[in-house]
């Protein structure tokens, strides 16, 4: 099955309360997911949006995952193999941040065939804008306010 995933993360303070939002589209079906965390970073929320969307798929899929996070796209397409080869240290010889999330993404990428795509954030891309709305609404719900 072919699936389009769009995802975004947001933080109120960085670190701070964060939210994530994802849209999954397959055939005529569109599904929206979102959530929040009380103490996180924008990068962790970007990654969580992708993880939750991929984890929600019931069987192996062909996925195009679109995000405005260069950190996420470059991590999965350029940096991951080097981190693994070097024992999860980065080019500065420091432990890779968010390793547990990268490892979850790696495991999910072995289940699904994923093409990682980057789009400029806050630039009028409808699905990216909607994911941002979902992420920000999740922050407000977490804080106890109506979105």
UniProtKB/Swiss-Prot annotation:
Disulfide bonds: none annotated. SUPFAM superfamilies: Ribonuclease H-like. GO terms for molecular function: magnesium ion binding; nucleic acid binding; RNA-DNA hybrid ribonuclease activity. Its EC number is 3.1.26.4. Mg(2+) 2 binds at residues 8, 132. Keywords: Cytoplasm, Endonuclease, Hydrolase, Magnesium, Metal-binding, Nuclease. It is found in: Cytoplasm. Binds 1 Mg(2+) ion per subunit. May bind a second metal ion at a regulatory site, or after substrate binding. GO terms for cellular component: cytoplasm. InterPro entries: RNase_H (IPR050092), RNaseH-like_sf (IPR012337), RNaseH_domain (IPR002156), RNaseH_sf (IPR036397), RNaseHI (IPR022892). One of its GO terms (biological process) is DNA replication, removal of RNA primer. It catalyses: Endonucleolytic cleavage to 5'-phosphomonoester. It is an enzyme of class 3 (hydrolase). The keyword Cell division does not apply. Mg(2+) 1 binds at residues 8, 46, 68. Belongs to the RNase H family. Endonuclease that specifically degrades the RNA of RNA-DNA hybrids. This is Ribonuclease H.
């Amino acid at each position: 099955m072919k699936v389009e995933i769009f995802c975004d993360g947001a933080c109120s303070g960085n670190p701070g309360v964060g939210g994530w939002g994802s849209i999954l589209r397959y055939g005529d079906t569109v599904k929206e997911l979102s959530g929040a965390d009380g103490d996180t970073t924008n990068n962790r929320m970007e990654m969580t949006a992708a993880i939750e969307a991929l984890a929600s798929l019931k069987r192996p899929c062909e996925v195009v995952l679109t995000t405005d996070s260069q950190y996420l796209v470059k991590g999965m397409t350029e940096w991951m193999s080097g981190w693994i080869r070097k024992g999860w240290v980065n080019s500065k010889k420091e432990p890779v941040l968010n390793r547990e999330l990268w490892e979850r993404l790696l495991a999910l990428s072995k289940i699904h065939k994923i093409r990682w795509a980057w789009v400029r954030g806050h630039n009028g891309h409808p699905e990216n804008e909607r994911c941002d709305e979902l992420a920000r609404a999740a922050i407000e719900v977490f804080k106890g306010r109506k979105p």
